[in-house]
Amino acid sequence: MDQPSVTFYRWDDMPKERVSEVLDRRLITGDRVMLTHVYIKRGGIVPRHSHANEQITYILEGGLRFWIGHDESEVIDVRAGEVLHIPSFVEHKAEALEDTVDVDIFSPPRQDWLDKTDDYLREK
């Protein structure tokens, strides 16, 4: 049996996709995990949504305010150097408190992001 090969990437070489006026992203995808850089302008909103994918968000620069749950009753501010874990199917919404760069990790990969069928992000 052949051993899988490894792949090396440089973020600056990855294409930056313009998703909306306030959100850009870069994607690196493996068989079972997706690593992304997400760039959100201050005041940019990620509308409430949920997905089957487990998510880990690590803020590199700036900060995001998250509203958790269908009723958005839990509010969590996540700033540079902090991490938020969002289990599968947990509804969440986010707003950029300032220009923000975050690393999102999804397992399994977000097929809607790969297919560009993530309309909830593209409407804003």
Predicted regions and their residues:
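Conserved metal-binding segment of the jelly-roll/cupin
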Residues: 41, 78-91, 95
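A short, N-terminal "cap"/entry segment at the start of jelly-roll beta-barrel domains
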Residues: 1-32, 36, 119-124
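Amphipathic, hydrophobic secondary-structure cores in small proteins
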Residues: 51-53, 83
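A short beta-strand-loop-beta hairpin characteristic of the jelly-roll/cupin
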Residues: 56-80, 90
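A beta-strand edge to alpha-helix "cap/lid" segment located at domain peripheries
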Residues: 67, 79-84, 111, 119
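Ligand-binding loop in jelly-roll beta-barrel domains
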Residues: 88-112
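ATP/adenylate-binding site constellation spanning eukaryotic-like Ser/Thr protein kinases
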Residues: 32-33, 53, 61, 99, ...
